[in-house]
Amino acid sequence: MGQFTVVSLGLLAVFLSLSGAKGDNCPANWISRNGVCNKLFPDRKTWLEAEMYCRALKPGCHLASLHRDSDSTVLAWYISDHFKGAGHVWIGLRDTNRKRTWKWSDRTSTNYFSWNQGEPNNVQDNENCVHLWAPSGYLKWNDEPCASLHPSICQYKL
């Protein structure tokens, strides 16, 4: 009877880990990083359209926010490896008041920046949204007019 109990508990542990009971699994086609799930959507949208699209996916979903170099590296690898030629990709950072005060759409703290050299430059006083800059391998950011059309990357917390 003792071996049966041990085997049963072992099978239960395997089943729970495969079923996602640990709470760290993202849906198919989403990637997991630092407690969040991300997915790139290749359809080109304005920044606001992209943010609204993310919000419609599920409660708490927004354009991606990045808070450390490792976040940038994981997303850069994901985009470069799976979406060749995606072009620039919207993230959730923007200057809503046009005062060069950058805020994430998910309202997390703005404690990390990865601007490309010379950015943000606010060309023609019209660049208030931020994308991952394709020529940098998606590691650096550029400010851009919010009406520009780009793919986007959505994110939600696990």
Swiss-Prot record:
Disulfide bonds join 26-37, 54-154, 129-146. GO terms for molecular function: carbohydrate binding; metal ion binding; toxin activity. GO terms for cellular component: extracellular region. Ca(2+) binds at residues 127, 142-143. Expressed by the venom gland. Keywords: Calcium, Disulfide bond, Hemagglutinin, Lectin, Metal-binding, Secreted, Signal, Toxin. SMART domains: CLECT. The keyword Zinc-finger does not apply. Residues 1-23 form the signal peptide. PANTHER family: MANNOSE, PHOSPHOLIPASE, LECTIN RECEPTOR RELATED. This is C-type lectin lectoxin-Enh6. It comes from Pseudoferania polylepis (Macleay's water snake).
